[in-house]
Amino acid sequence: MATTDPDRPISLAFVGHTTPDLADRAVAYEDAVLALLADHGARVVYRGRRRPGQDPALPLEVHLLWFPTRTAFDAYLADDRRVELLRRFGEVFTSKQVVEMDAISGVTTDIEAQ
């Protein structure tokens, strides 16, 4: 169950699918929008892209993002610069999933070790 505690850190997994004709635009959008994370105290833990030659039906990008609080995540979603990027680029993904993740007990991540 997702936490609603505004002061608790959250980690999110993002999986984005797109078509070959939108792929370059999707990458440019992600380059721009992910750069805003630091202004909200957040960071990209992992960003990966499908290898060339793989089935284009597979996700184009997968991200793991960390936010210091839910309030920071909400502020990122409402950031006027992010809204403008969405307007400028349009919908670049044909399908996307965002999953709030909990760390698995007994496994230390780089974030937890810091």
Predicted regions and their residues:
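Short, intrinsically disordered, mixed-charge
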Residues: A75-V83, E91
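A common structural junction motif
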Residues: V33-L34, R81-R87
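Generic beta-strand structural signal
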Residues: E61-H63, K96-Q97
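Short S/T/G/P-rich N-terminal loop/turn motif that feeds into the first structured element of a domain
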Residues: M1-E61, F67-A78, D102-Q114
